[in-house]
């Protein structure tokens, strides 16, 4: 992939867990010198998304962050590990590949890999493929990106988000795929960018039932962005029944509460940040 001088978010997928008309939510956070893959969706569709985005696996040099162990976020990671292990074995990948995640996410990933991948690949775990456990409040330097990790305090599944400081001073807060918890205010408030789930439109809440699934709506995401004084709001992890009108309708609903910039990307869309 050609070097870019701007920071970018490359949305590989934007859909919720059972989406069939778009890929599950995952993205690349890219600076001029670092490419961080955040989650990988629910299967080997991640390989197609990377190919469509013209990103070689060798471009994702060293870094992947898993928010949590749900199938639509972690199973694609197994495929990324498999393919990178193959590149390492064939001498086409230099250095190590590090997967960051909390204890449970890494435990699940390692178990699936060891139960399903050939020994020639799993033998690399711990040497060339490194599983780096992060804890609540940990601070990391991933390439030229500085991350502050935080437990989103989910009551459904242990999940971590992060606040990223990019080399030009831009700040980005990722809440994973569940609603904001007030205990994490310091990580999110005044961020330049907020990445937030919006399961559906508020007007469609009786159809998609976001609240019983620990999710929220575009209307509430807009209110959150306004409350936390962020500059730019990016919505993801949505239903996939309204893709033709999603960008306009989700933007319009979030804008009822938030006057900053709102982005509702399609799969494979790149946003300059």
Question: What is each model feature region?
Answer:
Residues 2-53, 158-177:
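Conserved beta-strand hairpin/beta-sheet module of binuclear metal-dependent hydrolase folds
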Residues 9, 39, 50, 68, ...:
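Divalent metal-coordination and catalytic microenvironments
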Residues 17, 71, 99, 105-106, ...:
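Short histidine/acidic/glycine/proline-rich micro-motifs that form metal-
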Residues 19-21, 133-203:
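Active-site-proximal loop/helix segment associated with metal-binding centers of metalloenzymes
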Residues 37-41, 60-72, 102, 172-178, ...:
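Active-site neighborhood of phospho(di)ester-bond hydrolases with catalytic His/Asp-centered motifs
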Residues 44-98:
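Active-site metal-binding motif and surrounding structural segment of the metallo-beta-lactamase
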Residues 93-158, 167, 263, 267:
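Metallo-beta-lactamase
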Residues 180-269:
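Cap/insert and terminal regions of metallo-dependent hydrolase folds
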């Amino acid at each position: 992939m050609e070097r870019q001088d701007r920071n970018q978010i490359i949305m590989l997928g934007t859909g919720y867990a059972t989406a069939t008309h778009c890929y599950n939510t995952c993205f690349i956070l890219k600076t001029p010198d670092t490419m961080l893959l955040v989650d990988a969706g629910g299967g080997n569709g991640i390989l197609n998304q990377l190919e469509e985005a013209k990103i070689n696996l060798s471009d994702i040099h060293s870094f992947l962050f898993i928010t949590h162990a749900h199938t639509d976020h972690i199973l694609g990671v197994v495929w990324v590990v498999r393919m990178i292990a193959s590149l390492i074995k064939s001498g086409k990948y230099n250095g190590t590949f590090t997967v960051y995640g909390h204890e449970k996410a890494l435990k699940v990933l390692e178990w699936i890999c060891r139960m399903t991948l050939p020994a020639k690949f799993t033998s690399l775990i711990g040497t060339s493929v490194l599983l780096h456990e992060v804890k609540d409040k940990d601070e990391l330097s991933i390439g030229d990106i500085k991350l502050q990790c935080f437990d989103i305090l989910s009551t459904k599944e242990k999940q971590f988000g992060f606040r990223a400081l990019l080399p030009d001073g831009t700040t980005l807060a990722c809440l994973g795929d569940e609603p904001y918890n007030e205990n994490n205010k310091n990580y999110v408030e005044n961020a330049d960018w907020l990445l937030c789930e919006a399961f559906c439109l508020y007007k469609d809440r009786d159809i998609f039932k976001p609240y019983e699934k620990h999710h929220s709506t575009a209307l509430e995401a807009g209110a959150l962005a306004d409350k936390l004084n962020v500059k730019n709001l990016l919505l993801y992890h949505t239903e996939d029944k309204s893709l033709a009108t999603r960008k306009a309708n989700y933007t319009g609903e979030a804008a009822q509460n938030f006057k900053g910039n709102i982005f509702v990307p399609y799969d494979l869309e790149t946003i300059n940040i």
